[in-house]
Design a protein with these regions (language model features):
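STAS-like cytosolic regulatory interaction modules
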Residues: 1-66, 78-122
Length: 122
């Protein structure tokens, strides 16, 4: 990625890649694959590393995420709470209508800022 301060190597377990991209002081975690009880610890570790380093805005991009279960939702809620304590914010980019419905039905969209695409702002 041109102009990126740091493109972290993909951290991977079977079924999930999490790539951390830092650019112009912002942090983006690109999540590719399925987030479930097996893969959620990877997301938790990478996300909390960023939360501890950056009390600003952390963006989690779920564009290439095909599934997220309650374990994955819990990881996002926990990270959002941690960032809130530090006066930061977690934003989740989730263009998939199916995944947005999961966020809405679970009530997680009331706890985590979810947008449909990166241009939706907030």
């Amino acid at each position: 990625m041109a102009g990126a301060a740091h493109d972290g190597p993909p951290d991977q377990v079977d079924g999930l890649d999490v790539v951390v991209i830092e650019k112009d002081g912002d942090t983006l975690l690109r999540v590719v694959g399925e987030v479930d009880s097996y893969t959620a610890p990877l997301l938790r570790r990478r996300l909390l590393q960023q939360v501890e380093r950056d009390a600003g805005e952390v963006v989690v991009d779920l564009t290439d995420t095909t599934l997220i279960d309650s374990t994955g939702l819990g990881v996002l809620v926990s990270a959002a709470a941690r960032l809130h304590e530090r006066r930061g914010r977690l934003m989740v980019v989730c263009p998939s209508p199916f995944l947005r419905e999961v966020f809405a039905l679970s009530g997680v969209d009331q706890l985590v800022h979810v947008v449909g695409a990166t241009g939706d702002g907030g």
